[in-house]
């Protein structure tokens, strides 16, 4: 292949290249650009908020407008900037380079993930153009307000579901890439710390995102068809919504933080000219955060009336998680201590982070104490705290990463003076914006108030100071945009390694070529700093044979599939459910998946090197299944809580056990048939393989038909909008039915690939992933039979 080939010049050629690319670097650039655009947009929203609060009794915004802008500010900053920039933006661009790989494990899935992410942003913002306007319920969309509001909540909920699907695919892809595509000789303990941070954040997100998905799905079901778990009128519990929501939304603070801690550590090591202090301890601290991060969510709920023991337990774990977080902070400080500091722009952001994050950490430990939390709950003290952690923590980390990798991403240097001016404006503006808010919290100002009276002591003066600080931040944002524009327009060309970095991305050109590396990488990795080690040992890097370089083909179908799925969610949000348009777009989405599955990923057969010996599809699906298990687990846990508390009482007339046993026979039998079909494929017996796969599909169709008939009968003989047990049955069993459809469609794709000859002895197409997913569907069904039909 011609490894120097470039897309044709011209606007349409460039646009087509972006729509069809599967190159991890281009996708990383698109993620990064979109995320920082979201940051700028959220910044504009914040200026509108602070303008409204600058003086008492201001009429710049109405209460409804203020609530809408506040909701979009929080959602845009958290979901579309902080998570995405550090994890999917820099991660997509840098992680394969750091691992010495040509691309991610699943390139087309990666492209689909980006376009779905972009669709989620558009979906959230387009609510402005529909009756009711943008959502005004806050980014937390607390029940019951979110169930009753007539604003654009449906669009917001649909956007969260689409974004969640994108995130899960992206996270599974990262973990599969890290496990499978490391350079030969690079063990897990020789990976750069940023790769470890992406791994930790991805694992945590895969496990915890189920909480947000469950909360979002259940509120959307109540809004669209009246199926409620949280409505007290039918025995539901509104606090259960908070349990679901915060089970994700506090762990996601660490998803927002971990990648940036990795970035800051990389920057500190490079500009201190010394190895990372306590590398192994930092890795263990990251994994400790992953474990403890799932045990702290309920500190957001100290004031909802839970038991004293409940509050003490979560207060303990909230304080405990400060230990691994503090370890990572001291690792960064220890790396800088005694180093030959090169005071470049990225390092300024590291130093600013250390001071501000320490302040945020101290106030976080304060809030873990239940008496103080009672005092400060929903006050501006909390607002200042989480901006300390996220704005001056993750936000500063994002700019450290942007300035650090900007020369590698763009091939251009930037004006150091402008970069430093940007930093100082942000630091001063941040401190002036949020330090007064701690005082406002002490003085009792609640968050989310759109105005206040002039006679409340201290409020007018402190709010004015905070608003002045916000405008200084805005000025810093303008300097940042100008710095980037000037660099792209006339910045000096960047050398391959402008900072003297030690990790593998600095071995590539600036910007990297399509195939990433021109040289054959050595198989010895003495430490996480291979460039330093190889230079010290005098290792000679030999050119790679172009015949050994294989890149995936571009494809239109990931973009098409994401676009049709986006259109499906628009139809769900904008129209009553069900409606004809949602079925039309769902059919178009299925068509895109068929075309995707039948398209060749590579121009000719390629033998992939994987560290684990498992295929990329196997590894990606294994980790995606973690998220699916989490989703069913949290819904089933919620159902068991309602059932054991006596709120969800089964009706006298329930679905028949004999039908469930018949379906169990069909589904369990299909697990055996798909297993033996896969076994036949491995032995090269293609006719028995195709027959076994066809039998599996038929059994799945029979299961779905029996289940549909049962649903139809029970639907017409039950008060499903008034009985909590029935609502839980339709939710969980219906969700399982959706998974049967998804799994069955995956098997159909594999069967079509088999008929086309795409599945061979060495290329199993989508079969491996589809069969694994099918076994999950079967296992979940056995649990469902036990808790709904037998019990």
From Swiss-Prot:
Keyword field contains Metal-binding: yes
Residues holding heme a3: 385
Cofactor(s) needed: Cu(2+); heme
SUPFAM superfamilies per UniProt: Cytochrome c oxidase subunit I-like, Cytochrome c oxidase subunit III-like
Residues given in the record as Cu cation binding sites: 250, 254, 299-300
Substrates-to-products reaction catalysed: 4 Fe(II)-[cytochrome c] + O2 + 8 H(+)(in) = 4 Fe(III)-[cytochrome c] + 2 H2O + 4 H(+)(out)
Ranges for region COX3: 545-791
Region (COX1): 1-473
Transmembrane stretches, start-end: 29-49, 78-98, 111-131, 155-175, 201-221, 244-264, 282-302, 312-332, 347-367, 381-401, 423-443, 464-484, 566-586, 617-637, 657-677, 691-711, 729-749, 771-791
Sites of the 1'-histidyl-3'-tyrosine (His-Tyr) crosslink: 250-254
PROSITE patterns in the record: COX1, COX1_CUB, COX3
Pfam families named among the record's database cross-references: COX1 (PF00115), COX3 (PF00510)
GO MF entries: cytochrome-c oxidase activity; heme binding; metal ion binding
Membrane topology, from the record: Multi-pass membrane protein
A GO biological-process term: respiratory electron transport chain
InterPro entries given in the database record: Cyt_c_oxase-like_su1_dom, Cyt_c_oxase-like_su1_sf, Cyt_C_Oxase_1, Cyt_c_Oxase_su1_BS, Cyt_c_oxidase-like_su3, Cyt_c_oxidase_su1_bac, Cyt_c_oxidase_su3-like_sf, Cyt_c_oxidase_su3_a-hlx
Location(s), subcellular: Cell membrane
Cofactor note: Binds 1 copper B ion per subunit.
Glycoprotein found in the keyword field: no
Domain of life from the UniProt record: Bacteria
Binding site for Fe(II)-heme a: 73, 387
Role this protein plays: Cytochrome c oxidase is the component of the respiratory chain that catalyzes the reduction of oxygen to water. Subunits 1-3 form the functional core of the enzyme complex. Co I is the catalytic subunit of the enzyme. Electrons originating in cytochrome c are transferred via the copper A center of subunit 2 and heme a of subunit 1 to the bimetallic center formed by heme a3 and copper B. This cytochrome c oxidase shows proton pump activity across the membrane in addition to the electron transfer.
Complex formation: Possibly a heterodimer of A-protein (contains: cytochrome c oxidase subunits I and III) and subunit II. The A-protein could also present a precursor form of subunits I and III.
Name the record gives this protein: Cytochrome c oxidase polypeptide I+III
Taxonomy of the source species: Bacteria, Thermotogati, Deinococcota, Deinococci, Thermales
């Amino acid at each position: 292949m011609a490894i120097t080939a470039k897309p044709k010049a011209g606007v349409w050629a460039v646009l087509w290249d972006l729509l069809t690319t599967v190159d991890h670097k281009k996708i990383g650039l698109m993620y990064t650009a979109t995320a920082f655009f979201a940051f700028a947009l959220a910044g504009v929203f914040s200026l509108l908020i602070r303008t409204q609060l600058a003086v008492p009794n201001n009429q710049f915004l109405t209460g409804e407008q203020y609530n809408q802008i506040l909701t979009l500010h929080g959602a845009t900053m958290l979901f579309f900037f902080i998570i995405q920039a550090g994890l999917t933006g820099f991660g997509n661009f840098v992680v394969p380079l750091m691992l010495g790989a040509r691309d991610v494990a699943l390139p087309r899935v990666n492209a689909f993930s980006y376009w779905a992410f972009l669709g989620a942003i558009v979906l959230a913002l387009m609510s402005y153009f529909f009756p009711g306007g943008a959502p005004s319920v806050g980014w937390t969309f607390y029940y019951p307000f979110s169930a009753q509001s007539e604003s654009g909540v449906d669009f917001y909920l649909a956007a969260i579901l689409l974004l969640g699907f994108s995130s899960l695919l992206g996270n599974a892809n990262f973990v599969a890439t890290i496990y499978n595509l490391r350079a030969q000789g690079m063990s897990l303990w020789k990976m750069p710390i940023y790769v470890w941070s992406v791994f930790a954040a991805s694992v945590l997100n895969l496990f915890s995102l189920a909480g947000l998905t469950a909360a979002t799905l259940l509120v959307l079901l109540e809004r669209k068809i009246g199926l409620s778990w949280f409505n007290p009128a039918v025995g539901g519990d509104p606090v259960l919504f908070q349990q679901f929501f915060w089970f994700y939304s506090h762990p996601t603070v660490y998803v927002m933080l971990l990648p940036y801690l990795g970035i800051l550590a990389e920057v500190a090591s490079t500009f201190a000219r010394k190895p990372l202090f306590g590398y192994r301890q930092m890795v263990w601290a990251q994994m400790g955060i992953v474990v403890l991060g799932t045990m702290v969510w309920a500190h957001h709920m100290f004031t909802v009336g839970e038991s004293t023991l409940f509050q003490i337990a979560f207060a303990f774990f909230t304080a405990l998680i400060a230990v691994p977080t503090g370890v990572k902070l001291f690792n960064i400080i220890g790396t800088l201590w005694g180093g030959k500091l090169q005071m470049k722009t990225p390092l300024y952001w590291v130093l600013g982070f250390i001071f501000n994050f320490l302040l945020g950490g101290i106030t976080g430990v304060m809030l873990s104490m239940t008496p103080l939390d009672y005092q400060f709950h929903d006050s501006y003290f909390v607002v200042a705290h989480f901006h300390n952690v996220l704005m001056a923590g993750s936000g500063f980390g994002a700019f450290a990463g942007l300035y650090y990798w900007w020369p590698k991403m763009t091939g251009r240097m930037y004006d150091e003076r402008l970069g430093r001016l940007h930093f100082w404006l942000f630091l001063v503006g941040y401190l002036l914006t949020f330090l007064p808010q701690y005082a406002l919290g002490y003085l009792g100002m609640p968050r989310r108030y759109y105005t206040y009276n002039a006679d409340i002591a201290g409020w007018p003066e402190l709010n004015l100071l905070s608003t002045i600080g916000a405008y200084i931040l805005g000025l810093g944002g303008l300097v940042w945009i100008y710095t980037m524009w000037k660099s792209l327009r006339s910045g000096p060309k960047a050398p391959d390694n402008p900072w003297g970095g030690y990790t593998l991305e600095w071995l590539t050109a600036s910007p990297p070529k399509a195939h990433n590396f021109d040289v054959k990488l050595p198989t010895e990795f003495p430490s996480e700093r291979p460039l330093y080690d190889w230079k010290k040992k005098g290792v000679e890097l030999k050119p790679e044979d172009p015949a050994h370089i294989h890149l995936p083909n571009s494809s239109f179908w990931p973009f098409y599939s994401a676009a049709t799925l986006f259109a499906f969610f628009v139809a769900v949000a904008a129209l009553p459910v069900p409606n004809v348009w949602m079925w039309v777009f769902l059919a178009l989405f299925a068509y895109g998946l068929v075309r995707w599955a039948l398209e060749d990923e590579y121009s000719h057969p390629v033998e992939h090197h994987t560290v684990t010996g498992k295929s990329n599809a196997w590894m990606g699906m294994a980790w995606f299944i973690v998220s699916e298990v989490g989703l069913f687990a949290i819904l089933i846990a919620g159902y068991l809580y309602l059932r054991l508390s006596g709120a969800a009482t089964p009706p006298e007339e329930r679905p028949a056990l004999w039908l469930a046993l018949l379906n169990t026979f069909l589904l369990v039998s299909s697990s055996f048939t798909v297993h033996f079909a896969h076994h036949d494929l491995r032995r090269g017996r293609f006719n028995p393989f195709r027959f076994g796969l066809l039998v599996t599909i038929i059994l799945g169709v029979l299961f779905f038909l029996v289940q549909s008939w049962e649903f139809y009968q029970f639907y017409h003989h039950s008060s499903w909008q008034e009985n909590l047990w029935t609502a839980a049955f339709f939710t969980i069993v219906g969700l399982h039915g959706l998974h049967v459809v998804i799994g069955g469609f995956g098997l159909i794709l594999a069967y079509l690939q088999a008929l086309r000859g795409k599945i061979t002895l060495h290329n199993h197409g989508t079969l491996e992933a589809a069969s694994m997913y099918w076994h999950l569907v079967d296992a979940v069904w056995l649990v469902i039979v036990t808790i709904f039909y037998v019990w």
